[in-house]
Amino acid sequence: GDWSSDVCSSDLGNAYPEVKQYLEMERKVLFTGTACQIAGLKNYLRKEYDNLYTVDVLCHGVPSPKIWRMYLEEQKKQYGASVEKAEFRNKVYGWNNYSVTIDFSGMQQYCVQFSEDQFMRMFISNLDLRPSCYACQFKALPRSSDMTIGDSWGIERVMPDLGDDKGISVILVHSQKGGRILQEVQEKLITREANLDEVLPPTADSRKSVAMHPNRKKYLRGLQNGESFDVLYGYVRKSFLQKAAGFIRYM
């Protein structure tokens, strides 16, 4: 299937060896991923390459691949069809209230605002993230990548004229190489300089480790004991909407 989002865990497969192979062939390589994936690549390569360009995406955390598979199975059961494509940032309801859409074989589609989707509720409430995400060593700035990109949530507070609900990206440059990349594409973009702490507050989940959900241990125990997706989802419980509002404002 096609999973169009930073909400799912990506499968790196043989990406690191392939990157090294292309670099040794003196080909230019652009590697994008989470900050921890880029740190892993740098650790694997053990040396700097002038022809390697790295861009990390702002990251809230990465959910369990197992719960993602369980979620897909639930969707397949409900619709009686296989999943062809999933999007977690669809703008059919606007950027701030983005929707989750799933295309099934047979032309069926599931489409709800993110705050109504069970998988997204578990993700945003920090219930189903990887253990390392609760003590992330890679969210500090500056990062080992050349650039960081992501959604500029809350931009309307800083630059009201940009609050059109169509989506604004934030770009952070960490190296001379990153600066050159931005300069080369600048004429194709509408850009504006901004204060870092205003567009990406230090309290944002993309700059600090997220807090563990109070029911996390119960959830893990249930996952290990083979509890159903619906039972596991029940551990989200209270204060979700409050958490979701904070997620939109400060991710």
Label every model-predicted segment:
Residues 7, 36, 133-136:
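Short cysteine clusters
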Residues 50-74, 202:
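Short, flexible loop segments at boundaries between secondary-structure elements
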Residues 11-22:
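A short, well-structured juxtamembrane/interface segment
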Residues 31-41, 61-63, 93:
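Gly/Ser/Thr-rich loops at beta-strand to alpha-helix junctions
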Residues 27-33, 52:
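Generic beta-sheet signal
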Residues 8-11, 56-63, 196:
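Short, acidic/turn-prone active-site loops that include or flank metal/cofactor-
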Residues 1-3, 7-9:
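Short, small-residue-biased leader/transition segments that mark boundaries at the very start
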Residues 81-251:
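Long, compositionally biased charged/polar accessory segments in the mid-to-C-terminal portions
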